[in-house]
């Protein structure tokens, strides 16, 4: 994006009140994997948002009377883009819970990668308007296999949180 905070605030100040403000939720989120410091440049499933700059932007936009949106990839991201969705449900629920705690109710979902109609679309609907009850969703979605799927996806999520994806390292 390459805009500093001052440029963001100035842009929002110049918008008419009917214009809605959308941020990539994870943009700029800082993280460390195996001692390598990095930050999210685009989207991330392994490092759930929102980032500090997205939080500040939504807060500023709301103060100025704008409706706000979170742009998120839930199914997958460039971290692992060749699959329809990544079954790391605890990370996806963590992201939705963080957005819910900020009263973010509007999303642009999985718009570029992983547009596959995965179970994650029902997770968003299940979590709308409150705390994301992952276990309740798994029971509704998976029936008697819910506990086994929960255990597996917790392991996947723990591993994926340590996935060494860094655009800065990748393209140097």
For every predicted segment, state its role.
Residues 1-172:
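Substrate-binding groove of N-acetylhexosamine-processing glycoside hydrolases
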């Amino acid at each position: 994006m390459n805009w500093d905070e001052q440029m963001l605030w100035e842009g929002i100040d110049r918008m008419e009140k009917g214009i809605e403000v959308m941020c990539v939720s994870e943009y700029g989120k800082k993280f460390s994997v195996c001692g390598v410091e990095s930050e999210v440049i685009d989207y991330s499933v392994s490092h759930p948002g929102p980032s500090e700059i997205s939080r500040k932007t939504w807060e500023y936009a709301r103060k100025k009377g704008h409706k706000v949106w979170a742009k998120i990839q839930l199914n997958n991201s460039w971290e692992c883009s060749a699959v329809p969705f990544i079954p790391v449900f605890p990370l996806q629920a963590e992201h939705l819970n963080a957005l819910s705690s900020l009263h973010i109710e509007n999303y642009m979902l999985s718009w570029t990668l992983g547009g596959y109609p995965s179970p994650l679309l029902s997770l968003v609907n299940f979590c709308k308007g409150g705390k994301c009850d992952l276990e309740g969703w798994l029971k509704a979605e998976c029936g008697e296999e819910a506990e086994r799927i929960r255990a597996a996806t917790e392991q996947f999520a723990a591993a994926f949180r340590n996935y060494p994806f860094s655009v800065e390292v990748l393209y140097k």
